Amino acid sequence: MNKDTIFSAPIEKLGDFTFDESVAEVFPDMIQRSVPGYSNIITAIGMLAQRFVTEGSQVYDLGCSRGAGILSIRRNLQTNQVKIIGVDNSQPMVERCRSHINAYHSDVPVEILCDDIRHIEIKNASMVVLNFTLQFLPRADRLELLTKIYQGLNPNGILVLSEKFTFTNQAMSELLIDLHHTFKRANGYSELEVSQKRTALENVMLTDSIETHKDRLKQAGFSQIELWFQCFNFGSMIAVK
């Protein structure tokens, strides 16, 4: 696993964070050291797939990055009569995802598309995964995507939505942000790395509160919604049709 050193030296003109070649190369290390509970979420996505994915249906991982979620799903399926579709708009991520998926033999077909997730038709879905993806979409586009997902899910289909959250209580918000930064420092990131990455993400990662997510999921049509995992200001929700 290549180590993430992208923000380790001072960057004079710090642009917005993008999932480019340099990020794709170190992404597994970056996300493990940056997102508390990430490996637990990936494991649980497989458990949920075991329970919810049905024969003859399709599974979508929207914003699939290098394919960790897809592999977890595929390992846990009860049937190989399923198609998994992974979508990411980063060509470097897609290339590595395809290579990663192909390194493991399986009879379950997987298609990896380089596209904008807003352009993807969702149909005959028993499971859809948005793992730290929605927060990178413009807020104005989020409800439309979730509505499209709801409509494309089969009855008893599941959406897994993992996000970084904001909190309305200022003191609690500051505490959870500070704990997250402590987590990153404990994983070897310097103050400079934490600061520069935070600045790079400011304009591209627009986070919402748990309440906002729940309200939006209800507007999209979901009625069974639950926060099943949280660590500091990161978490994952499930919504069942």
Curated annotation (Swiss-Prot):
SUPFAM superfamilies, sorted: S-adenosyl-L-methionine-dependent methyltransferases
EC nos: 2.1.3.-
GO molecular function terms attached to this record: carboxyl- or carbamoyltransferase activity; S-adenosyl-L-methionine binding
Keywords in alphabetical order: S-adenosyl-L-methionine, Transferase
Enzyme class: transferase
Positions that bind S-adenosyl-L-methionine: Y38, G63, C64, S65, D88, N89, D116, I117, N131, R198
Keyword Phosphoprotein among UniProt keywords: no
Recorded catalytic activity of this chain's protein: prephenate + S-adenosyl-L-methionine = carboxy-S-adenosyl-L-methionine + 3-phenylpyruvate + H2O
One GO BP annotation of this record: tRNA wobble uridine modification
Task performed by this protein: Catalyzes the conversion of S-adenosyl-L-methionine (SAM) to carboxy-S-adenosyl-L-methionine (Cx-SAM).
Quaternary structure and interacting proteins, as annotated: Homodimer.
Family: Belongs to the class I-like SAM-binding methyltransferase superfamily. Cx-SAM synthase family.
Protein name, as recorded: Carboxy-S-adenosyl-L-methionine synthase
Native source species: Actinobacillus pleuropneumoniae serotype 7 (strain AP76)
The gene coding this protein: cmoA
